[in-house]
């Protein structure tokens, strides 16, 4: 059976999401991929290399605004609808990837992704900058939408763009977290 790098990443995503990083051995990952350990190390010499590649693809690339949202110029209401659609579509895509028919803990597949995020926070070197960049992207999106809404008269002219954008973003960040945890 021929296994390529993309297949290794997808199968490793499932393993890391359903197990702790420490518990997932290279041997188990290789077996799941239909490879020998040597075959796995051809693609990723160390488990951390594989974990970082999984995080880069399925956390950082997936959560990047250019991959998550399809905004068109419009009203604040349309922006909110497009933002929600982007979050929901992203989670549906991730759940489809994670749902391989194997659910050892009986958890929501959304929760497995949340579990992966916590591991990324613990094990990905210098992750703070990458997380901050995602947060900043979202904050800029909301600032831009609030600024446009203020200029177009959709919201009061005396509202502070920065504070209003933070309020909206924090509300949707909470909503997105609840979406991750729902069954």
Q: What role is predicted for each listed range?
A:
Residues 47, 54, 58, 62, ...:
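Hydrophobic/aromatic residues within well-ordered alpha-helical segments
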Residues 7, 11, 15-61, 72:
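Helix-turn-helix
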Residues 44, 115-123:
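Short helix-capping/turn signature of helix-turn-helix
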């Amino acid at each position: 059976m021929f296994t390529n790098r993309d297949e290794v990443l997808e199968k490793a995503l499932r393993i890391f999401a359903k197990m702790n990083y420490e518990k997932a051995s290279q041997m188990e990952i290789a077996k799941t991929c239909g490879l020998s350990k040597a075959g796995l190390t051809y693609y990723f010499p160390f488990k951390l290399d594989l974990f970082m590649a999984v995080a880069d693809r399925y956390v950082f690339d997936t959560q990047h605004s250019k991959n998550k949202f399809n905004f068109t110029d419009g009203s604040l209401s349309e922006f909110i609808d497009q933002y929600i659609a982007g979050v929901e579509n992203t989670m549906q895509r991730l759940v489809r990837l994670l749902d391989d028919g194997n659910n050892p803990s009986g958890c929501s597949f959304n929760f497995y992704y949340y579990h992966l995020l916590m591991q990324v926070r613990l094990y990905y070197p210098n992750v703070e900058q990458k997380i901050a960049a995602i947060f900043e992207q979202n904050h800029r999106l909301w600032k831009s939408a609030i600024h446009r809404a203020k200029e177009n008269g959709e919201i009061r002219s005396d509202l502070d763009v920065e504070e209003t954008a933070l309020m909206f973003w924090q509300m949707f960040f909470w909503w997105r977290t609840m979406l991750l945890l729902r069954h």
